[in-house]
């Protein structure tokens, strides 16, 4: 097929040079033999010297999108328009213009458990809305959009196991967010060496001293609001923010030397292979209530096993559809079970190796983006 693809290659803008979606959405399409014309949002921003998602970006990108698509469509008609866009990226009018040219349109989205509001406006204009979280179909139908379940996966030609000795007992790659600090603290307090890589585990550079003072000022503000707010709900909310702030501040001392700034994509892949155990967390804050957490699957559930890493994360029924619990991926229900299983598999290396290998076989055999795309195109009768 001839496919027009547009996306931002990064899955996390706080990680300089991240090309996560380039590796997972673009490269597998090429690998399958499709002809792909790629329009990268980061390159559009660079070309016009504007900030991605700044005030000018949406209008500029919409113009570039229509111009590029029309130009390439004139050269040779497309079989599919495929995008990873949200409401902040593109004007609805641009999508309508492309739709008028008669090319099937598909948009991919994820994080819809807590960020569905980001795609509510544009979704009805696509023929197919590919969602990674299984239950997002209900939300999409409610706004008149056509849902197609397109689960997360990983590209085995990028997430390649590396040989060598283990560098870390336990590692976590991701931001200090939601209940992650709580779980990490529980492990550290019980003597587990945990290395964390990602945003907010350390005070971000540059201007660390200034940012530290700003955070302390915010803490005082939260404390006053927790003490004097007339709303019990607000008092609870700001008390919780102070608790997590103090917990992380204390962890930076008790776990000194094991918190790290965000790492590159290549470093991340290496960490997955060189950690005895990789931790993941499915929990995110609720879209409507920041005091409540919900669960959804991430790329990590497929990246780590693809790198032949031993992976432990929260139990979920949806995850159990992809991996057999405690035989291909280790799953926990609470902090006590997490600690118990981490201790067990650090001590029982043969058992750990069996799960590591089984998880790799399942990921590489069933959960590749090459297989996801092949199944998707067969389902949509696109070849």
Identify the residue ranges that each predicted region occupies.
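Glycine-rich, highly charged phosphate/nucleotide-binding loops
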Residues: 51-73
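Active-site proximal beta-strand in glycosyltransferases
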Residues: 97-112, 130
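Structural alpha-helical scaffold elements that stabilize or flank donor/cofactor-binding regions
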Residues: 74, 121-122, 271
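Short N-terminal targeting/anchoring amphipathic segment
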Residues: 72-88
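A conserved, positively charged/aromatic
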Residues: 118-129
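A charged, aromatic-enriched C-terminal amphipathic alpha-helix characteristic of glycosyltransferases
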Residues: 347-378
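Conserved acidic donor-binding segment of nucleotide-sugar-dependent glycosyltransferases
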Residues: 329-335, 345-349
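Nucleotide-sugar donor-binding catalytic core of glycosyltransferases
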Residues: 1-52, 85, 90-93, 128-319
């Amino acid at each position: 097929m001839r496919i027009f693809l547009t996306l931002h290659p990064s899955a996390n803008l706080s990680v300089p040079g991240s090309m996560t979606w380039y590796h997972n959405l673009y490269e597998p399409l090429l690998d399958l033999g499709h002809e792909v014309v790629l329009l990268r949002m980061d390159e559009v921003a660079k070309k016009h010297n504007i900030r991605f998602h700044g005030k000018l970006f949406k209008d500029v990108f919409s113009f570039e999108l229509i111009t590029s698509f029309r130009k390439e469509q004139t050269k040779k008609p497309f079989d599919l328009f495929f995008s990873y866009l949200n409401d902040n990226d593109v004007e609805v009018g641009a999508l309508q213009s492309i739709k008028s040219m008669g090319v099937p349109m598909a948009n991919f989205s994820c994080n819809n458990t807590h960020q569905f509001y980001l795609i509510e406006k544009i979704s009805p204009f696509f023929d197919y809305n590919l969602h990674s979280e299984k239950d997002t179909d209900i939300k999409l139908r409610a706004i008149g959009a056509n849902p197609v379940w397109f689960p997360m996966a990983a590209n085995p030609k990028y997430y390649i196991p590396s040989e060598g000795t283990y560098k870390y007992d336990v590692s976590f790659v991701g931001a200090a967010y939601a209940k992650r600090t709580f779980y990490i603290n529980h492990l550290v307090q019980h003597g587990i060496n945990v290395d964390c890589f990602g945003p907010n585990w350390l005070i971000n550079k540059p201007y660390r001293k200034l940012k530290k003072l700003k955070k302390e000022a915010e803490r005082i503000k939260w404390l006053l609001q927790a003490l004097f707010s007339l709303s019990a709900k607000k008092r609870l909310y700001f008390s919780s923010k102070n608790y997590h702030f103090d917990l992380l501040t204390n962890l930076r001392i008790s776990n000194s030397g094991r918190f790290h700034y965000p790492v590159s994509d290549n470093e991340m892949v290496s960490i997955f292979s060189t950690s005895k155990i990789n931790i993941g967390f499915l929990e995110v804050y609720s879209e409507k209530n920041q005091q409540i957490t919900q669960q959804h699957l991430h790329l990590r559930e497929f990246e780590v096993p693809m790198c032949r890493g031993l992976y432990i994360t929260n139990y979920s029924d949806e995850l159990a559809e992809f991996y057999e619990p405690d035989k291909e991926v280790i799953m926990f229900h609470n902090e006590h079970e997490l600690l118990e299983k981490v201790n067990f598999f650090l001590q029982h290396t043969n058992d750990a190796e069996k799960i590591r290998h089984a998880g790799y076989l399942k990921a590489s055999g069933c959960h590749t983006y090459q297989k996801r795309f092949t199944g998707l195109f067969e389902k949509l009768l696109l070849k």
